[in-house]
Amino acid sequence: MRNTTFLVLNVMLLVSVALFCAADPEMEKSSFAEILDTGNPEQERKCLAEAADCSPWSGDSCCKPYLCSCIFFYPCSCRPKGW
């Protein structure tokens, strides 16, 4: 039983590392800290004017004064802060 649990946890860890490494190529263009601080300007251009849509990489700048809310990255939508 211990071996099975250990194997399952190792597989889950490997899959999560593989998904992280295969992240969107847009992320390689700037440092992660810069994206967290300022948002990715290339993604911000893709925001809808009425701020009904956002992406996990654009941050809340698309949604002002709302927050960008995502369920497992997609679909993302702008929602009031209380949600």
From Swiss-Prot:
Belongs to the neurotoxin 07 (Beta/delta-agtx) family. InterPro entries: Beta/delta-agatoxin_fam (IPR016328). This is U2-hexatoxin-Hi1a. It is found in: Secreted. Inhibits sodium channels (Nav) of insects. Keywords: Disulfide bond, Ion channel impairing toxin, Knottin, Neurotoxin, Secreted, Signal, Toxin, Voltage-gated sodium channel impairing toxin. Residues 24-45 form a propeptide. GO terms for molecular function: sodium channel regulator activity; toxin activity.
